Amino acid sequence: MSIYLDYNASSPINKDVIEYMVDVYSNSYGNADSRTHIYGENARNIVENARKDIADLIGVQAGEVFFTSGSTESNNIALLGLKQYANDVNKKHIIISSIEHKAVLEAARSME
């Protein structure tokens, strides 16, 4: 029996999620930002329903859920928000651990 411990980069996907995504990828190939046709509308509905489901799951408003292209973009957005907050409350330092993800370290270094 093996045990997978590297959940930082990837993780196993729930079988229900795989089944749902296969259906989406097979039948809903419109661009969610192209709402001038039914394919875009269908894709937009899928995205917005997912946003609402996630918001309900974590107890926030749907407008507070943002989708990004991946962890690097998410880390950058979070750190830029933290930097703005630190500036607003007149704090001069953000402390980052040396064992953080490379994207976090690089984003923090760019703020020095």
Report the location of each language-model feature.
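Pyridoxal 5′-phosphate
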Residues: 1-112
